Amino acid sequence: MALPPVYIVSTARTPIGSFQGSLSSLTYSDLGAHAVKAALAKVPQIKPQDVDEIVFGGVLQANVGQAPARQVALKAGLPDSIVASTINKVCASGMKAVIIGAQNIICGTSDIVVVGGAESMSNTPYYLPSARSGARYGDAIMVDGVQKDGLLDVYEEKLMGVAAEKCAKDHGFSREDQDNFAINSYKKAGKALSEGKFKSEIAPVTIKGFRGKPDTVIENDEEIGKFNEERLKSARTVFQKENGTVTAPNASKLNDGGAALVLVSEAKLKQLGLKPLAKISGWGEAARTPFDFTIAPALAVPKAVKHAGLTVDRVDFFELNEAFSVVGLANAELVNIPLEKLNVYGGAVAMGHPLGCSGARIIVTLLSVLTQEGGRFGVAGVCNGGGGASAVVIEKIDADAKL
């Protein structure tokens, strides 16, 4: 049975800031609202009161405040009547938000849905668990919220990077393989930046100056400019001291950012005279043993491709979130994705990985790739802690449509 079409009519994202870097003064809701405002500004036919709901991803929610997605919506100027849902599927949160938004349109409960995700990893607090019951005597332990709720496998009680080391060993990828993948990610991202490939998707952020200092406009992803090939090759391994392969430079970083997409039904597309950028053709989700989350996209991507009525060889470009270089390498090998079709503008190793944002960000970038490099079908996939993964297939509708 053919499903009713769901169209992407606008996308936008913030630049991605480094940990404690250029965007660290902004909260989750600041980052999300900026992306939402920018996406809606590109489609003036859609008035704030026309938007039925917002579905927004966010992982590190401690101290963010009640109902984070609702905060994003109201800060972006959407009306009090907006229905808001916050999604936490770890790194796949932003993509799950896109899937839910599309499903709601297909079900007929909404016609216009703003979807996406954000994360301010810089502002995630430390926890003091013993304070609730009273730390009556002696030292009290502080818990890093980023690590506890974002980067730690709760079943093995080991960091995500240890799982990446397991993946490298299981699939035979060396330190050199991962370093070369990371170097290529940085070089592709640097080339895309220098050629202006990200301009259509990035909404520059103005950071207010203080104590007489001028405002600062952040226009580019902060991590890309930090690339140093020699330092990357000489970096120490982080998660496994002896015979380890995963380093800080060949893994994604801790980051801040937000991304948003505007989805509409076919009826609303025609009623408002909107020009579609792409159609959401299918999606797939899968899960396996929690500590093997790194290769869960190898299950989700084929499911999404099948759901869209395609085969992998018909897909023009792929975006796989580079939580670690080995994630890109292993899943490309398992799904038979040619590396020349993968992350052609670089990935999270070079650009950064704000957890709740990334699943939406890679769809935004995938659409940029399809638009500027001449493709029709694209697949975005992302693994998530706990053993899961999500994937989305999009089809470029109009080669002349501008982002």
Swiss-Prot record:
GO BP annotations listed: ergosterol biosynthetic process; fatty acid beta-oxidation
Task: Give the pathway listed in the UniProt entry for this protein.
Answer: Metabolic intermediate biosynthesis; (R)-mevalonate biosynthesis; (R)-mevalonate from acetyl-CoA: step 1/3
Please tell me where this protein is predominantly located: other
Task: Please state which protein family the record places this protein in.
Answer: Belongs to the thiolase-like superfamily. Thiolase family.
Gene3D superfamilies cross-referenced by the UniProt entry: 3.40.47.10
Membrane-spanning residues = none
Taken from the record, one Pfam family name reads Thiolase_C
Mind telling me which GO cellular component terms the entry cites? mitochondrion; peroxisome
Q: Which gene encodes it?
A: PACTA
EC number(s)? 2.3.1.9
Sorted keywords for this record are: Acyltransferase, Peroxisome, Transferase
According to its UniProt record, which residues of this chain constitute the active site? Answer: C91, H353, C383
| Protein name per the record | Acetyl-CoA acetyltransferase IA
Question: Domain of life, per the record?
Answer: Eukaryota
Subcellular location, record wording: Peroxisome
- Family annotation (SUPFAM superfamilies): Thiolase-like (SSF53901)
**Reaction catalysis annotation:** 2 acetyl-CoA = acetoacetyl-CoA + CoA
Question: Can you state the subunit structure given in the record?
Answer: Multimeric.
Cite the PROSITE patterns for this sequence.
THIOLASE_1, THIOLASE_2, THIOLASE_3
What the entry lists under CDD domains is as follows: thiolase
Find motif (Microbody targeting signal) and give its ranges.
401-403
GO MF annotations, alphabetized: acetyl-CoA C-acetyltransferase activity
